[in-house]
Curated annotation (Swiss-Prot):
Residues 35-47 have a biased composition (Basic and acidic residues). Residues 1-48 are annotated as: Disordered. Its main location: nucleus. It comes from the Eukaryota. It holds the Pfam family DOG1. This is Transcription factor TGA2. The gene is TGA2.
Length: 330
């Protein structure tokens, strides 16, 4: 019994020491667990951010892909439409009749309507010129001549109105001059005559003129020449710009990206071609204003003679065309 008591005490001391060690281990384990939880929390936040970024990137990628597919579809539709328009243009292109005595245009209803209106206009003008010639030969008074001259000028205004409407439908028909005879087309400038050249031709037809009239006609001729040069330079710039637009980009490739680029080039070129109508309108305004200024400088009788000389000049050009086309061919 005496031997067992000390062992019992020692055993009791050992038992009292273990709970303290267990508490310290529990604290260490708890701290480690908290650190692990925080690390996992940080990892989870990074993962969530990364996942959110991936989802956003995927969403943007889908949107870009959808937009690209839509762009390709639009380009395909535009290309198909353009091919159809080109096919119609080839089927309804401008041609010259086999007899060669008359220029015909099948460039659409607009061109045909203009040709018909111009023919009626020319027929009416011939009647006016016959009346004016008869009045001059009969030595009619200025009041009678003034009425006829004003009628001729109003008729010219009607021509430029007809041409303005025609330019909206088919500006190339006006520029090509297919509504004119071959000899007239040799002198064609922006769908009509050069005012400065007509004034040169009239110089010998209107004598005698006062010094003031000569100065007025010379100034008008120079002003017209300057305006014509400016319009001609504008046309040259437009042609160069069109050439640059159509020649840019990759040639010979039919990839989807190049189709979109091609359609973009065509859209730019179409926009530039739209300015052609403005050139025709400005050229016709210059022609009309030159005629009106000429009438103001000249007397009534001189104005009548000038209008008659212009008419006779173009009549001779048309007659020359007929003779040329009817010439013997070996």
């Amino acid at each position: 019994m005496a031997d067992t008591s000390p062992r019992t005490d020692v055993s009791t001391d050992d038992d009292t020491d273990h709970p303290d060690l267990g508490s310290e281990g529990a604290l260490v384990n708890t701290a480690a667990s908290d650190s692990s939880d925080r690390s996992k929390g940080k990892m989870d936040q990074k993962t969530l951010r990364r996942l959110a970024q991936n989802r956003e990137a995927a969403r943007k990628s889908r949107l870009r892909k959808k937009a690209y597919v839509q762009q390709l579809e639009n380009s395909r539709l535009k290309l198909t439409q353009l091919e159809q328009e080109l096919q119609r243009a080839r089927q309804q292109g401008v041609f010259i009749s086999g007899t060669g005595d008359q220029a015909h245009s099948t460039g659409g209803n607009g061109a045909l309507a203009f040709d018909a209106e111009h023919s009626r206009w020319l027929e009416e003008k011939n009647k006016q010129m016959n009346e004016l010639r008869s009045a001059l030969n009969a030595h009619a008074g200025d009041s009678e001549l003034r009425i006829i001259v004003d009628g001729v000028m109003a008729h010219y205004e009607e021509l430029f109105r007809i041409k303005s409407n025609a330019a909206k439908n088919d500006v190339f028909h006006l520029l090509s001059g297919m509504w004119k005879t071959p000899a007239e087309r040799c002198f064609l400038w922006l769908g009509g005559f050069r005012s400065s050249e007509l004034l040169k031709l009239l110089a010998n037809q209107l004598e005698p003129m006062t010094e003031r009239q000569l100065m007025g006609i010379n100034n008008l001729q120079q002003t017209s020449q300057q305006a014509e040069d400016a319009l001609s330079q504008g046309m040259e710039s437009l042609q160069q710009s069109l050439a640059d637009t159509l020649s840019s980009g990759t040639l010979g490739s039919s990839s989807s990206g190049n189709v979109a680029s091609y359609m973009g080039q065509m859209a730019m070129a179409m926009g530039k071609l739209g300015t052609l109508e403005g050139f025709i309108r400005q050229a016709d305004n210059l022609r009309l204003q030159t005629l009106q200024q000429m009438i103001r400088v000249l007397t009534t009788r001189q104005s009548a003679r000038a209008l008659l000389a212009i008419h006779d000049y173009f009549s001779r050009l048309r007659a020359l065309s007929s003779l040329w086309l009817a010439r013997p061919r070996e």
